[in-house]
Amino acid sequence: MDHIYICRFFSIPNTIKTKNKSHTCPDLSGAGSFFIPFGSNLPKPESINFLRGYGIWGAIDRLGIPKFLQKDLNSSTGFLIAHGEVLPREENSVSLSKRTDKWGIPIPHIEFKWSENELNMAKHMESTIRDSIEAADGDIRGIDELIKIPYVGLFTEKSIALSGNPPPPGYYIHEVGGAAMGFNEEESVVNKLNQLWRCSNVLVLDGACWPTSSWQSPTLTMMAISRRACLNIKKT
């Protein structure tokens, strides 16, 4: 699994009345951005035609674009990136290919595509992003409309990440679920404490052990799962 996502850049009327925004705007980071969880001001549940949810990461004037490259000094530049949960499906799988690498080891063969559920979610993401930007008196813009870089349009117009459709699986590099945990050996690779069923001293601690992608960014959850597994080793 990987997160399905939609990314949009935008401009809004200047939010900070100062000659030097760098004094008040930190660099893009966890503290210099915001996150909108799924669930706020939703319409009635029956109008949602997909399972699970998504969140929206964004920031305004945190991209560090030098003033001389900005096309409109009277506006602020921002972005919104929605990423959502992908449901585990038997059709999405990893197996060994007949092809081998230069050491003669079979390479992974990955079967993975978005389902109707994810594509419906992506449409809802797009609608929510547009509504959010409009509510802030903003306009969705292409990169070439925001910054002055020669020929940037030649690259962005073919960018998969900035296209109207969600990029293919693997593009967001939040891959998880290749060795999922579960309740028994027949349906999973590791147990609830991340141990291989037949070799308890081998642990899978990265995103491979996840039975679902959830919609949050995976790093902190990976750290928490790793800590729990290590505490269990210490205890036993």
Regions found by a protein language model. Give the residues of each.
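FAD cofactor-binding and catalytic pocket of flavoenzymes
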Residues: M1-N120, G164, P169-E175, W197, ...
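Glycine-rich loop(s) and the adjacent beta-strand/alpha-helix scaffold that form part
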Residues: M1-T15, D206, T221, I225, ...
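Generic structural signal for well-ordered, non-membrane alpha-helical segments
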Residues: Y5, E118-A122, E126, T219-M222
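A glycine-rich dinucleotide-binding beta-alpha-beta segment and adjacent secondary-structure elements
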Residues: S75-I81, H124-S213, T219
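Generic, well-ordered alpha-helical scaffold segments in large soluble proteins
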Residues: R99, M125-A136, A229-T236
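Glycine-rich loops and low-complexity Gly/Arg-rich segments
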Residues: G104-H109, L119-A122, A135-D137, L205-G207, ...
